[in-house]
Every structure is written in structure tokens, then in C-alpha cells.
């Protein structure tokens, strides 16, 4: 994994972390947030490991999905709204599973280099 890939993919994790920190600081009586040190540590660790998680998920998925899958299905880009929703769900999944898959991605990255 290159530094460019890491920086490109850490932006989503940073965005979610900054939203969480903003909501903690602007917390009113309407919202309930888990404001503990352990929760903040988990979010920071997830942010750091989010690109590794995405790398591991892509590495595993592309072992099962071959190039001919995309060549045969030429109408994958005909539904941009569904594609955007799927992309956001994928990024959220990478952030939520960042710690276990991030460690796996870190292992794969070290093994490939």
C-alpha cells in the first residue's frame, strides 16, 4: 500500500471522527453520545486503521471477483444513485470494521512488501 492510497482513504475516517468530536463539543440535551475516553480511543484507532481495512476488504474481494465480471456487466454505471448509496455503505462498513480488518490489511501490506 502506498502513502497516496493511505492519505486518499483516511479522509472518510477523519471526516467521521471530526463529526463525532464536533457533536460531543456541541452536545445539547437532545442528543445522547457515548462520551468516554475508551470510545474516543476506539474512534481514533478506527480512523488510523480505516485505510488498512479498505485495503484488506479490496484484497479479499478481488481474489473472488475476476476481471471478466466487470467486462460482462457493462450497465453497472446506469444507476448512479444506487451506486453512490452502495459506495457510502461500503465506506461505513470499512470504518466500522476498521480494527479487525485494519489489522488484517496491515498484515497483508507487510507481507506483500
Curated annotation (Swiss-Prot):
InterPro entries: Microcin (IPR003061). Keywords: Bacteriocin immunity, Plasmid. It holds the Pfam family Microcin. The keyword Ion transport does not apply. The keyword NAD does not apply. Coiled coil: none annotated. It comes from the Bacteria. GO terms for molecular function: toxic substance binding. GO terms for biological process: bacteriocin immunity. This protein is able to protect a cell, which harbors the plasmid ColE1 encoding colicin E1, against colicin E1. This is Colicin-E1 immunity protein. It comes from Escherichia coli.
